[in-house]
Amino acid sequence: DPWMRNHMPKITMYQSGGAFEQKEDAPFVQSFKKAFHDVTDTEIKVVGSPAGCDSRLWKRIAGAQVFQYGPGNQEQCHSINEYVDVEEFYKAILVYAHFILTWAQR
């Protein structure tokens, strides 16, 4: 297209984070695992996420310690008819609250 050739779009990248890794033995992660166990009386399995999320920006750009956790299951996340079980939601609230309180008291 002649017009497009003479009026190329200008693309500006305002953020980029790329992939990231958070070591499982990091104190932040270990503290969360303990909080999860304290609330649920079960161990949480640490796995990688196949989806993109803002954690990459916090880790790679801001240098923050991060992890991803939420109610529901990874296989169903961001799919058609996505939903979260109410009990899972309530459990996540308790886990978050316990983690925040115990991490803040370190």
Predicted regions and their residues:
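Metal-dependent amide/peptide-bond hydrolase catalytic core
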Residues: 1-106
